Amino acid sequence: MPTLIDATSTPAWGTLSGLKSRFADGPHKLRRLFDADPHRAERYTLDVADLHVDLSKNLLTDEIRDALLELAAQMRVTERRDAMYAGEHINVTEDRAVLHTALRRSRTDELHVDGQDAVADVHEVLDKIYAFADKVRSGEWKGVTGKPIRTVINVGIGGSDLGPVMAYEALKPYVKDGLECRFISNIDPTDAAVKTADLDPETTLVIIASKTFTTLETLTNARCVRAWLLDGLVAAGAISDTEQARRDAVAKHFVAVSTALDKVEEFGIDPVNAFGFWSWVGGRYSVDSAVGTSLAVAIGPKGFEDFLAGFHAVDEHFATAEPERNVPLFMGLLNIWYTNFWDAHSHAVLPYSQYLHRFPAYLQQLTMESNGKSVRWDGSAVTTDTGEIFWGEPGTNGQHAFYQLIHQGTRVIPADFIAVANPVHPTKDGGTDVHELFLSNFFAQTAALAFGKTADEVRAEGTDEAIVPARVFAGDRPTTSIMADELSPKVLGELIALYEHITFVQGVVWGIDSFDQWGVELGKKLALQIAPAVSGNDEALATQDPSTQGLVTWYREHRR
Protein backbone atom coordinates (compact mmCIF):
# COMPACT_ATOMS: atom_id res chain seq x y z
CA MET A 1 0.00 0.00 0.00
CA PRO A 2 1.19 3.57 -0.62
CA THR A 3 2.00 5.88 2.25
CA LEU A 4 -1.10 7.50 3.72
CA ILE A 5 -1.37 11.20 2.90
CA ASP A 6 -3.19 13.52 5.30
CA ALA A 7 -5.41 15.72 3.14
CA THR A 8 -5.33 18.55 5.68
CA SER A 9 -1.54 18.81 5.29
CA THR A 10 -1.60 19.27 1.52
CA PRO A 11 -1.01 22.69 -0.07
CA ALA A 12 -4.35 22.40 -1.87
CA TRP A 13 -6.22 22.07 1.44
CA GLY A 14 -4.72 25.33 2.64
CA THR A 15 -5.60 26.98 -0.65
CA LEU A 16 -9.20 25.84 -0.35
CA SER A 17 -9.43 27.15 3.21
CA GLY A 18 -8.39 30.57 1.98
CA LEU A 19 -10.77 30.46 -0.97
CA LYS A 20 -13.65 29.55 1.33
CA SER A 21 -12.95 32.55 3.55
CA ARG A 22 -12.98 34.91 0.59
CA PHE A 23 -15.94 33.28 -1.13
CA ALA A 24 -18.12 33.51 1.97
CA ASP A 25 -18.18 37.32 1.92
CA GLY A 26 -21.49 38.91 0.92
CA PRO A 27 -24.91 37.61 -0.07
CA HIS A 28 -26.13 36.34 -3.44
CA LYS A 29 -22.77 35.17 -4.66
CA LEU A 30 -24.24 32.94 -7.35
CA ARG A 31 -26.17 35.88 -8.78
CA ARG A 32 -22.92 37.81 -9.10
CA LEU A 33 -21.10 34.86 -10.64
CA PHE A 34 -23.78 34.32 -13.29
CA ASP A 35 -23.97 38.06 -14.01
CA ALA A 36 -20.20 38.21 -14.46
CA ASP A 37 -20.03 35.17 -16.74
CA PRO A 38 -22.83 34.70 -19.32
CA HIS A 39 -21.27 31.33 -20.25
CA ARG A 40 -21.06 29.95 -16.71
CA ALA A 41 -23.85 27.40 -17.21
CA GLU A 42 -22.32 26.16 -20.43
CA ARG A 43 -18.82 25.91 -18.95
CA TYR A 44 -19.95 23.97 -15.89
CA THR A 45 -22.29 21.57 -17.67
CA LEU A 46 -20.81 18.18 -18.46
CA ASP A 47 -22.10 15.00 -20.07
CA VAL A 48 -21.32 11.47 -18.95
CA ALA A 49 -22.85 8.76 -21.13
CA ASP A 50 -26.60 9.61 -21.23
CA LEU A 51 -26.49 11.91 -18.20
CA HIS A 52 -26.52 15.69 -18.62
CA VAL A 53 -25.01 17.24 -15.49
CA ASP A 54 -25.25 20.96 -14.68
CA LEU A 55 -22.79 21.93 -11.93
CA SER A 56 -23.08 25.67 -12.47
CA LYS A 57 -25.31 26.32 -9.45
CA ASN A 58 -22.63 25.09 -7.07
CA LEU A 59 -20.56 27.41 -4.87
CA LEU A 60 -17.75 27.26 -7.35
CA THR A 61 -15.32 29.42 -9.26
CA ASP A 62 -12.56 28.44 -11.66
CA GLU A 63 -10.07 29.04 -8.87
CA ILE A 64 -11.97 26.75 -6.51
CA ARG A 65 -12.33 24.12 -9.23
CA ASP A 66 -8.60 24.17 -9.90
CA ALA A 67 -7.80 23.88 -6.19
CA LEU A 68 -10.17 20.91 -5.83
CA LEU A 69 -8.56 19.18 -8.80
CA GLU A 70 -5.14 19.91 -7.31
CA LEU A 71 -6.31 18.32 -4.06
CA ALA A 72 -7.27 15.20 -6.02
CA ALA A 73 -3.84 15.16 -7.63
CA GLN A 74 -2.05 15.60 -4.32
CA MET A 75 -4.16 12.83 -2.76
CA ARG A 76 -3.38 10.59 -5.78
CA VAL A 77 -7.02 9.85 -6.48
CA THR A 78 -6.36 8.68 -10.04
CA GLU A 79 -3.60 6.32 -8.88
CA ARG A 80 -5.95 4.84 -6.31
CA ARG A 81 -8.66 4.53 -8.97
CA ASP A 82 -6.26 2.66 -11.26
CA ALA A 83 -5.31 0.35 -8.39
CA MET A 84 -8.99 -0.45 -7.82
CA TYR A 85 -9.60 -1.18 -11.50
CA ALA A 86 -6.50 -3.42 -11.61
CA GLY A 87 -7.71 -5.58 -8.73
CA GLU A 88 -5.20 -4.49 -6.10
CA HIS A 89 -6.29 -5.12 -2.51
CA ILE A 90 -7.41 -1.60 -1.69
CA ASN A 91 -9.86 -2.93 0.92
CA VAL A 92 -7.08 -2.93 3.47
CA THR A 93 -8.83 -4.09 6.64
CA GLU A 94 -10.19 -7.20 4.90
CA ASP A 95 -7.24 -7.62 2.50
CA ARG A 96 -9.50 -7.80 -0.54
CA ALA A 97 -9.67 -6.50 -4.06
CA VAL A 98 -12.53 -4.13 -4.88
CA LEU A 99 -13.86 -5.11 -8.27
CA HIS A 100 -17.49 -4.19 -8.70
CA THR A 101 -16.33 -2.61 -11.97
CA ALA A 102 -15.46 -6.12 -13.23
CA LEU A 103 -19.13 -7.08 -12.96
CA ARG A 104 -19.92 -5.01 -16.04
CA ARG A 105 -16.82 -5.48 -18.19
CA SER A 106 -17.06 -6.91 -21.67
CA ARG A 107 -16.94 -10.65 -22.16
CA THR A 108 -13.79 -10.21 -24.27
CA ASP A 109 -11.85 -8.51 -21.46
CA GLU A 110 -9.48 -10.26 -19.08
CA LEU A 111 -8.64 -9.34 -15.50
CA HIS A 112 -6.62 -11.77 -13.43
CA VAL A 113 -7.04 -11.36 -9.69
CA ASP A 114 -5.61 -13.75 -7.13
CA GLY A 115 -5.00 -16.31 -9.88
CA GLN A 116 -8.48 -16.14 -11.42
CA ASP A 117 -9.83 -14.37 -14.50
CA ALA A 118 -12.51 -12.29 -12.78
CA VAL A 119 -14.22 -11.27 -16.02
CA ALA A 120 -14.56 -14.86 -17.23
CA ASP A 121 -15.98 -15.85 -13.84
CA VAL A 122 -18.50 -13.00 -14.00
CA HIS A 123 -19.78 -13.97 -17.43
CA GLU A 124 -20.05 -17.63 -16.47
CA VAL A 125 -22.43 -16.63 -13.66
CA LEU A 126 -24.27 -14.14 -15.88
CA ASP A 127 -24.91 -16.83 -18.48
CA LYS A 128 -26.34 -19.05 -15.77
CA ILE A 129 -28.56 -16.24 -14.46
CA TYR A 130 -29.81 -15.40 -17.95
CA ALA A 131 -30.69 -19.02 -18.68
CA PHE A 132 -32.60 -19.20 -15.41
CA ALA A 133 -34.35 -15.89 -16.06
CA ASP A 134 -35.45 -17.05 -19.50
CA LYS A 135 -36.90 -20.25 -18.04
CA VAL A 136 -38.92 -18.37 -15.44
CA ARG A 137 -40.12 -15.72 -17.90
CA SER A 138 -41.11 -18.25 -20.57
CA GLY A 139 -42.97 -20.50 -18.14
CA GLU A 140 -40.54 -23.38 -18.65
CA TRP A 141 -39.63 -23.21 -14.95
CA LYS A 142 -42.68 -24.43 -13.09
CA GLY A 143 -43.58 -24.91 -9.48
CA VAL A 144 -44.09 -28.31 -7.92
CA THR A 145 -47.70 -28.50 -9.17
CA GLY A 146 -46.77 -27.60 -12.74
CA LYS A 147 -47.92 -23.99 -12.66
CA PRO A 148 -45.67 -21.21 -14.04
CA ILE A 149 -44.16 -18.64 -11.71
CA ARG A 150 -46.06 -15.39 -11.25
CA THR A 151 -44.31 -13.91 -8.19
CA VAL A 152 -40.62 -13.81 -7.27
CA ILE A 153 -39.74 -13.05 -3.64
CA ASN A 154 -36.22 -11.80 -2.95
CA VAL A 155 -35.17 -12.51 0.64
CA GLY A 156 -32.09 -10.53 1.64
CA ILE A 157 -30.97 -7.54 3.66
CA GLY A 158 -28.64 -4.58 3.19
CA GLY A 159 -27.01 -4.74 -0.21
CA SER A 160 -28.93 -7.92 -1.01
CA ASP A 161 -32.18 -5.97 -0.67
CA LEU A 162 -31.71 -2.22 -1.11
CA GLY A 163 -30.19 -2.47 -4.58
CA PRO A 164 -32.62 -5.00 -6.05
CA VAL A 165 -35.75 -3.34 -4.65
CA MET A 166 -34.59 0.12 -5.76
CA ALA A 167 -33.80 -1.08 -9.27
CA TYR A 168 -37.03 -3.07 -9.56
CA GLU A 169 -39.10 -0.07 -8.50
CA ALA A 170 -37.18 2.21 -10.88
CA LEU A 171 -37.62 -0.12 -13.84
CA LYS A 172 -41.20 -1.30 -13.32
CA PRO A 173 -42.20 -0.21 -16.84
CA TYR A 174 -39.71 -2.80 -18.15
CA VAL A 175 -40.99 -5.69 -16.00
CA LYS A 176 -42.63 -8.58 -17.86
CA ASP A 177 -46.42 -8.48 -17.76
CA GLY A 178 -47.85 -11.01 -15.35
CA LEU A 179 -44.68 -11.18 -13.28
CA GLU A 180 -44.16 -9.42 -9.95
CA CYS A 181 -41.24 -9.19 -7.53
CA ARG A 182 -41.54 -8.65 -3.81
CA PHE A 183 -38.76 -8.08 -1.32
CA ILE A 184 -38.48 -9.25 2.28
CA SER A 185 -35.65 -7.90 4.41
CA ASN A 186 -36.75 -6.81 7.88
CA ILE A 187 -36.65 -9.48 10.57
CA ASP A 188 -39.85 -7.95 11.94
CA PRO A 189 -42.33 -10.79 11.22
CA THR A 190 -44.72 -8.22 9.79
CA ASP A 191 -42.57 -7.82 6.69
CA ALA A 192 -42.81 -11.44 5.59
CA ALA A 193 -46.43 -11.78 6.71
CA VAL A 194 -47.61 -8.77 4.72
CA LYS A 195 -45.55 -9.59 1.62
CA THR A 196 -46.88 -13.16 1.40
CA ALA A 197 -50.46 -12.61 2.60
CA ASP A 198 -52.11 -12.53 -0.83
CA LEU A 199 -49.74 -14.82 -2.72
CA ASP A 200 -50.30 -18.29 -4.12
CA PRO A 201 -47.52 -20.64 -3.00
CA GLU A 202 -47.99 -22.69 -6.18
CA THR A 203 -46.86 -19.78 -8.37
CA THR A 204 -44.24 -18.25 -6.06
CA LEU A 205 -40.47 -18.55 -6.45
CA VAL A 206 -38.13 -17.46 -3.64
CA ILE A 207 -34.58 -16.17 -4.11
CA ILE A 208 -32.51 -16.26 -0.92
CA ALA A 209 -29.62 -13.81 -1.24
CA SER A 210 -26.85 -14.31 1.30
CA LYS A 211 -23.21 -14.73 0.29
CA THR A 212 -22.34 -16.86 3.33
CA PHE A 213 -25.87 -18.21 3.84
CA THR A 214 -25.50 -17.32 7.52
CA THR A 215 -26.99 -13.80 7.70
CA LEU A 216 -29.32 -13.95 10.71
CA GLU A 217 -32.12 -11.80 9.31
CA THR A 218 -32.05 -13.39 5.88
CA LEU A 219 -31.98 -17.00 7.07
CA THR A 220 -34.70 -16.35 9.65
CA ASN A 221 -36.92 -14.83 6.98
CA ALA A 222 -36.03 -17.61 4.54
CA ARG A 223 -37.14 -20.28 7.01
CA CYS A 224 -40.36 -18.38 7.71
CA VAL A 225 -41.12 -18.06 4.00
CA ARG A 226 -40.28 -21.72 3.47
CA ALA A 227 -42.74 -22.66 6.22
CA TRP A 228 -45.41 -20.39 4.70
CA LEU A 229 -44.95 -21.88 1.25
CA LEU A 230 -44.85 -25.53 2.33
CA ASP A 231 -47.71 -25.22 4.81
CA GLY A 232 -49.75 -23.43 2.16
CA LEU A 233 -49.13 -26.16 -0.39
CA VAL A 234 -50.09 -28.84 2.12
CA ALA A 235 -53.21 -26.95 3.25
CA ALA A 236 -54.34 -26.55 -0.36
CA GLY A 237 -53.84 -30.24 -1.01
CA ALA A 238 -51.21 -29.40 -3.62
CA ILE A 239 -48.62 -31.70 -1.99
CA SER A 240 -48.77 -34.42 0.61
CA ASP A 241 -47.53 -33.74 4.11
CA THR A 242 -44.38 -35.84 3.84
CA GLU A 243 -40.71 -34.94 4.12
CA GLN A 244 -40.08 -36.02 0.53
CA ALA A 245 -42.94 -33.91 -0.83
CA ARG A 246 -41.68 -30.92 1.11
CA ARG A 247 -38.13 -31.41 -0.18
CA ASP A 248 -39.42 -31.65 -3.75
CA ALA A 249 -41.36 -28.41 -3.28
CA VAL A 250 -38.34 -26.53 -1.90
CA ALA A 251 -36.28 -27.65 -4.90
CA LYS A 252 -38.88 -26.20 -7.28
CA HIS A 253 -39.65 -23.00 -5.41
CA PHE A 254 -36.31 -21.86 -3.93
CA VAL A 255 -33.02 -20.75 -5.45
CA ALA A 256 -30.04 -19.06 -3.82
CA VAL A 257 -27.56 -16.29 -4.40
CA SER A 258 -24.65 -17.61 -2.38
CA THR A 259 -21.24 -19.26 -2.53
CA ALA A 260 -21.85 -21.48 0.52
CA LEU A 261 -23.10 -24.45 -1.49
CA ASP A 262 -23.05 -26.84 1.47
CA LYS A 263 -25.40 -24.61 3.46
CA VAL A 264 -27.56 -24.01 0.39
CA GLU A 265 -27.97 -27.77 -0.05
CA GLU A 266 -28.67 -28.24 3.65
CA PHE A 267 -31.56 -25.76 3.30
CA GLY A 268 -33.00 -27.94 0.55
CA ILE A 269 -31.91 -26.00 -2.53
CA ASP A 270 -30.17 -27.83 -5.36
CA PRO A 271 -26.66 -26.29 -5.59
CA VAL A 272 -27.18 -26.17 -9.36
CA ASN A 273 -29.69 -23.42 -8.61
CA ALA A 274 -27.24 -21.30 -6.64
CA PHE A 275 -25.73 -18.22 -8.27
CA GLY A 276 -22.38 -17.16 -6.85
CA PHE A 277 -20.48 -13.96 -6.38
CA TRP A 278 -17.12 -13.11 -4.93
CA SER A 279 -15.34 -11.66 -1.91
CA TRP A 280 -14.27 -8.72 -4.06
CA VAL A 281 -17.90 -7.60 -4.43
CA GLY A 282 -19.16 -5.64 -1.44
CA GLY A 283 -22.85 -5.93 -0.64
CA ARG A 284 -23.64 -2.30 -1.37
CA TYR A 285 -21.89 -2.60 -4.74
CA SER A 286 -23.57 -5.87 -5.73
CA VAL A 287 -26.87 -5.02 -7.45
CA ASP A 288 -25.26 -5.77 -10.82
CA SER A 289 -23.97 -9.16 -9.63
CA ALA A 290 -25.99 -12.31 -8.93
CA VAL A 291 -27.67 -10.27 -6.19
CA GLY A 292 -29.63 -8.73 -9.06
CA THR A 293 -31.06 -12.08 -10.14
CA SER A 294 -34.59 -10.99 -9.24
CA LEU A 295 -34.12 -7.93 -11.45
CA ALA A 296 -32.79 -10.06 -14.31
CA VAL A 297 -35.91 -12.23 -14.08
CA ALA A 298 -38.15 -9.16 -13.97
CA ILE A 299 -36.69 -7.15 -16.87
CA GLY A 300 -35.10 -10.01 -18.78
CA PRO A 301 -31.51 -10.70 -19.86
CA LYS A 302 -31.57 -7.95 -22.51
CA GLY A 303 -32.73 -5.39 -19.96
CA PHE A 304 -30.07 -6.53 -17.51
CA GLU A 305 -27.39 -6.31 -20.19
CA ASP A 306 -28.46 -2.72 -20.85
CA PHE A 307 -28.30 -2.09 -17.09
CA LEU A 308 -24.71 -3.36 -17.01
CA ALA A 309 -23.84 -1.30 -20.10
CA GLY A 310 -24.84 1.84 -18.22
CA PHE A 311 -22.50 1.02 -15.36
CA HIS A 312 -19.68 0.28 -17.77
CA ALA A 313 -20.12 3.54 -19.67
CA VAL A 314 -19.58 5.54 -16.48
CA ASP A 315 -16.71 3.26 -15.41
CA GLU A 316 -14.99 4.08 -18.69
CA HIS A 317 -15.66 7.78 -18.28
CA PHE A 318 -14.24 7.76 -14.74
CA ALA A 319 -11.17 5.87 -15.96
CA THR A 320 -10.40 7.98 -19.03
CA ALA A 321 -11.93 11.47 -18.86
CA GLU A 322 -9.62 14.39 -18.17
CA PRO A 323 -9.93 15.59 -14.56
CA GLU A 324 -11.65 18.86 -15.47
CA ARG A 325 -14.29 16.92 -17.48
CA ASN A 326 -14.54 13.93 -15.14
CA VAL A 327 -18.01 14.06 -13.62
CA PRO A 328 -17.66 11.55 -10.74
CA LEU A 329 -14.32 13.08 -9.77
CA PHE A 330 -15.72 16.60 -9.86
CA MET A 331 -18.87 15.71 -7.90
CA GLY A 332 -16.90 13.80 -5.29
CA LEU A 333 -14.61 16.79 -4.82
CA LEU A 334 -17.61 19.10 -4.48
CA ASN A 335 -18.87 16.90 -1.67
CA ILE A 336 -15.49 17.31 0.04
CA TRP A 337 -15.76 21.08 -0.48
CA TYR A 338 -19.13 21.25 1.25
CA THR A 339 -18.48 18.74 4.03
CA ASN A 340 -15.06 19.97 5.04
CA PHE A 341 -15.11 23.66 4.18
CA TRP A 342 -18.80 24.62 4.43
CA ASP A 343 -19.68 22.46 7.45
CA ALA A 344 -22.41 20.63 5.54
CA HIS A 345 -23.55 17.60 7.49
CA SER A 346 -26.08 16.20 5.05
CA HIS A 347 -26.72 15.84 1.35
CA ALA A 348 -30.16 15.74 -0.26
CA VAL A 349 -30.93 13.60 -3.30
CA LEU A 350 -34.19 14.72 -4.89
CA PRO A 351 -35.39 12.63 -7.83
CA TYR A 352 -38.16 14.19 -9.89
CA SER A 353 -39.32 10.72 -10.89
CA GLN A 354 -41.64 8.65 -8.74
CA TYR A 355 -39.98 5.52 -10.10
CA LEU A 356 -36.79 6.60 -8.29
CA HIS A 357 -38.52 6.83 -4.92
CA ARG A 358 -36.14 4.24 -3.39
CA PHE A 359 -32.99 5.78 -4.86
CA PRO A 360 -32.20 8.00 -1.82
CA ALA A 361 -32.51 4.99 0.51
CA TYR A 362 -30.18 3.02 -1.75
CA LEU A 363 -27.65 5.85 -1.66
CA GLN A 364 -27.84 5.95 2.12
CA GLN A 365 -26.22 2.54 2.32
CA LEU A 366 -23.82 3.18 -0.55
CA THR A 367 -22.48 6.42 0.88
CA MET A 368 -22.96 6.15 4.63
CA GLU A 369 -21.79 2.56 5.04
CA SER A 370 -18.82 3.31 2.78
CA ASN A 371 -17.67 6.62 4.26
CA GLY A 372 -19.10 6.65 7.77
CA LYS A 373 -15.65 6.04 9.26
CA SER A 374 -13.58 7.73 11.96
CA VAL A 375 -10.41 5.69 11.38
CA ARG A 376 -8.19 5.83 8.31
CA TRP A 377 -7.03 2.75 6.45
CA ASP A 378 -3.72 2.70 8.36
CA GLY A 379 -5.54 2.62 11.73
CA SER A 380 -4.98 6.26 12.63
CA ALA A 381 -7.78 8.64 13.53
CA VAL A 382 -9.19 10.83 10.79
CA THR A 383 -8.18 14.48 10.90
CA THR A 384 -11.37 15.96 9.50
CA ASP A 385 -15.08 15.25 9.18
CA THR A 386 -16.02 12.30 6.98
CA GLY A 387 -19.30 11.16 5.51
CA GLU A 388 -22.62 12.92 5.14
CA ILE A 389 -26.19 11.95 5.91
CA PHE A 390 -27.81 11.20 2.56
CA TRP A 391 -31.55 11.61 2.40
CA GLY A 392 -34.38 12.67 0.14
CA GLU A 393 -37.80 12.03 -1.32
CA PRO A 394 -39.21 12.38 -4.82
CA GLY A 395 -40.33 15.82 -5.94
CA THR A 396 -42.80 17.38 -5.50
CA ASN A 397 -43.53 15.55 -2.25
CA GLY A 398 -40.37 16.91 -0.66
CA GLN A 399 -41.29 20.48 -1.59
CA HIS A 400 -44.26 20.26 0.77
CA ALA A 401 -42.25 18.59 3.52
CA PHE A 402 -38.60 19.54 4.03
CA TYR A 403 -37.53 21.99 1.31
CA GLN A 404 -38.16 24.77 3.83
CA LEU A 405 -35.02 23.66 5.68
CA ILE A 406 -32.96 23.62 2.49
CA HIS A 407 -34.16 27.08 1.44
CA GLN A 408 -34.07 28.98 4.73
CA GLY A 409 -32.32 26.82 7.31
CA THR A 410 -29.04 27.77 8.96
CA ARG A 411 -26.87 25.06 7.39
CA VAL A 412 -25.79 24.55 3.81
CA ILE A 413 -27.42 21.40 2.44
CA PRO A 414 -26.08 20.50 -1.01
CA ALA A 415 -28.76 18.87 -3.14
CA ASP A 416 -28.74 16.74 -6.27
CA PHE A 417 -31.84 17.10 -8.45
CA ILE A 418 -32.53 14.23 -10.88
CA ALA A 419 -35.08 14.31 -13.71
CA VAL A 420 -35.91 12.73 -17.06
CA ALA A 421 -37.24 14.51 -20.14
CA ASN A 422 -39.72 11.85 -21.19
CA PRO A 423 -42.24 10.33 -18.79
CA VAL A 424 -43.52 6.77 -18.91
CA HIS A 425 -47.09 8.00 -18.50
CA PRO A 426 -47.69 11.22 -20.52
CA THR A 427 -50.77 12.86 -19.05
CA LYS A 428 -52.83 15.96 -19.84
CA ASP A 429 -54.85 17.99 -17.36
CA GLY A 430 -57.05 19.84 -19.79
CA GLY A 431 -54.54 21.58 -21.98
CA THR A 432 -51.67 21.23 -19.50
CA ASP A 433 -48.95 18.63 -19.93
CA VAL A 434 -48.61 17.31 -16.37
CA HIS A 435 -44.98 16.21 -16.82
CA GLU A 436 -44.08 19.71 -17.97
CA LEU A 437 -45.79 21.11 -14.89
CA PHE A 438 -43.84 18.60 -12.79
CA LEU A 439 -40.49 19.56 -14.33
CA SER A 440 -41.31 23.25 -14.02
CA ASN A 441 -40.99 22.62 -10.30
CA PHE A 442 -37.64 20.88 -10.85
CA PHE A 443 -36.25 23.88 -12.74
CA ALA A 444 -37.82 26.42 -10.36
CA GLN A 445 -36.45 24.86 -7.20
CA THR A 446 -32.83 24.86 -8.34
CA ALA A 447 -33.16 28.48 -9.47
CA ALA A 448 -34.79 29.54 -6.20
CA LEU A 449 -32.12 27.78 -4.14
CA ALA A 450 -29.33 29.36 -6.17
CA PHE A 451 -30.54 32.93 -6.54
CA GLY A 452 -32.95 33.45 -3.66
CA LYS A 453 -34.98 36.60 -3.18
CA THR A 454 -33.73 39.91 -1.81
CA ALA A 455 -35.51 42.14 0.69
CA ASP A 456 -36.06 44.74 -2.03
CA GLU A 457 -37.69 42.14 -4.26
CA VAL A 458 -39.97 41.13 -1.40
CA ARG A 459 -40.90 44.77 -0.71
CA ALA A 460 -41.62 45.32 -4.41
CA GLU A 461 -44.43 42.79 -4.06
CA GLY A 462 -46.12 45.02 -1.48
CA THR A 463 -45.22 42.83 1.47
CA ASP A 464 -45.77 44.24 4.97
CA GLU A 465 -42.38 45.40 6.29
CA ALA A 466 -42.81 43.38 9.46
CA ILE A 467 -42.65 40.10 7.58
CA VAL A 468 -40.10 41.05 4.93
CA PRO A 469 -37.25 39.24 6.77
CA ALA A 470 -39.25 36.02 6.90
CA ARG A 471 -39.82 36.11 3.15
CA VAL A 472 -36.22 36.78 2.13
CA PHE A 473 -34.34 33.86 0.56
CA ALA A 474 -30.58 34.13 0.92
CA GLY A 475 -29.89 31.91 -2.08
CA ASP A 476 -26.45 30.41 -2.59
CA ARG A 477 -27.84 26.97 -1.71
CA PRO A 478 -25.79 24.65 -3.93
CA THR A 479 -27.43 22.19 -6.29
CA THR A 480 -26.39 19.84 -9.06
CA SER A 481 -28.94 19.02 -11.76
CA ILE A 482 -28.77 15.60 -13.43
CA MET A 483 -31.01 14.94 -16.43
CA ALA A 484 -31.52 12.08 -18.85
CA ASP A 485 -33.75 11.43 -21.83
CA GLU A 486 -35.66 8.66 -20.03
CA LEU A 487 -35.30 6.31 -17.09
CA SER A 488 -34.12 3.19 -18.90
CA PRO A 489 -32.10 0.25 -17.52
CA LYS A 490 -28.96 1.79 -19.04
CA VAL A 491 -29.60 5.20 -17.49
CA LEU A 492 -30.24 3.64 -14.08
CA GLY A 493 -26.93 1.80 -14.33
CA GLU A 494 -25.24 5.09 -15.17
CA LEU A 495 -26.77 6.82 -12.15
CA ILE A 496 -25.69 4.08 -9.76
CA ALA A 497 -22.14 3.95 -11.12
CA LEU A 498 -21.90 7.74 -10.93
CA TYR A 499 -22.58 7.69 -7.20
CA GLU A 500 -20.34 4.65 -6.64
CA HIS A 501 -17.39 6.58 -8.02
CA ILE A 502 -18.34 9.81 -6.22
CA THR A 503 -18.25 7.82 -2.98
CA PHE A 504 -14.87 6.36 -3.90
CA VAL A 505 -13.34 9.79 -4.57
CA GLN A 506 -14.42 11.08 -1.17
CA GLY A 507 -13.02 8.03 0.60
CA VAL A 508 -9.63 8.45 -1.06
CA VAL A 509 -9.39 12.11 -0.06
CA TRP A 510 -10.34 11.26 3.53
CA GLY A 511 -7.87 8.36 3.63
CA ILE A 512 -10.48 5.84 4.74
CA ASP A 513 -11.35 2.33 3.60
CA SER A 514 -14.67 2.82 1.83
CA PHE A 515 -15.14 -0.91 1.33
CA ASP A 516 -15.37 -2.37 4.83
CA GLN A 517 -18.26 -2.00 7.27
CA TRP A 518 -17.12 -3.00 10.73
CA GLY A 519 -19.67 -0.63 12.24
CA VAL A 520 -22.46 -3.13 11.65
CA GLU A 521 -20.76 -5.96 13.55
CA LEU A 522 -20.97 -4.93 17.21
CA GLY A 523 -24.73 -4.57 17.36
CA LYS A 524 -25.21 -7.93 15.61
CA LYS A 525 -23.03 -9.71 18.16
CA LEU A 526 -24.71 -8.01 21.10
CA ALA A 527 -28.13 -8.98 19.76
CA LEU A 528 -27.13 -12.65 19.92
CA GLN A 529 -25.92 -12.17 23.51
CA ILE A 530 -29.09 -10.37 24.58
CA ALA A 531 -31.51 -12.78 22.88
CA PRO A 532 -31.55 -15.30 25.80
CA ALA A 533 -32.40 -12.47 28.22
CA VAL A 534 -35.27 -11.39 26.00
CA SER A 535 -36.54 -14.97 26.00
CA GLY A 536 -36.60 -15.14 29.81
CA ASN A 537 -33.09 -16.13 30.91
CA ASP A 538 -32.48 -14.16 34.11
CA GLU A 539 -28.77 -15.00 34.22
CA ALA A 540 -28.31 -13.52 30.77
CA LEU A 541 -30.34 -10.49 31.82
CA ALA A 542 -28.10 -9.91 34.83
CA THR A 543 -25.05 -9.47 32.57
CA GLN A 544 -26.57 -6.46 30.81
CA ASP A 545 -26.19 -2.79 31.71
CA PRO A 546 -28.93 -1.25 33.91
CA SER A 547 -30.64 0.53 31.02
CA THR A 548 -30.82 -2.59 28.87
CA GLN A 549 -31.98 -4.62 31.88
CA GLY A 550 -34.81 -2.16 32.44
CA LEU A 551 -35.90 -2.17 28.81
CA VAL A 552 -35.82 -5.96 28.53
CA THR A 553 -37.69 -6.34 31.81
CA TRP A 554 -40.40 -3.94 30.64
CA TYR A 555 -40.70 -5.88 27.40
CA ARG A 556 -41.01 -9.22 29.21
CA GLU A 557 -43.70 -7.82 31.49
CA HIS A 558 -45.75 -6.51 28.58
CA ARG A 559 -45.26 -9.26 25.98
CA ARG A 560 -48.49 -11.24 25.57
From Swiss-Prot:
It holds the Pfam family PGI. The active site is at residues 369, 400, 524. It catalyses: alpha-D-glucose 6-phosphate = beta-D-fructose 6-phosphate. InterPro entries: G6P_Isomerase, G6P_Isomerase_C, Phosphoglucose_isomerase_CS, SIS_dom_sf, SIS_PGI_1, SIS_PGI_2. It is found in: Cytoplasm. GO terms for cellular component: cytosol. GO terms for molecular function: carbohydrate derivative binding; glucose-6-phosphate isomerase activity; monosaccharide binding. Keywords: Cytoplasm, Gluconeogenesis, Glycolysis, Isomerase. The keyword Lyase does not apply. It is an enzyme of class 5 (isomerase). GO terms for biological process: gluconeogenesis; glucose 6-phosphate metabolic process; glycolytic process. Its EC number is 5.3.1.9. Signal peptide: none annotated. Pathway: Carbohydrate biosynthesis; gluconeogenesis; Carbohydrate degradation; glycolysis; D-glyceraldehyde 3-phosphate and glycerone phosphate from D-glucose: step 2/4. Gene3D superfamilies: 1.10.1390.10, Glucose-6-phosphate isomerase like protein, domain 1. HAMAP family: G6P_isomerase. PANTHER family: GLUCOSE-6-PHOSPHATE ISOMERASE. Belongs to the GPI family. Catalyzes the reversible isomerization of glucose-6-phosphate to fructose-6-phosphate. This is Glucose-6-phosphate isomerase. It comes from Cutibacterium acnes (strain DSM 16379 / KPA171202) (Propionibacterium acnes). The gene is pgi.
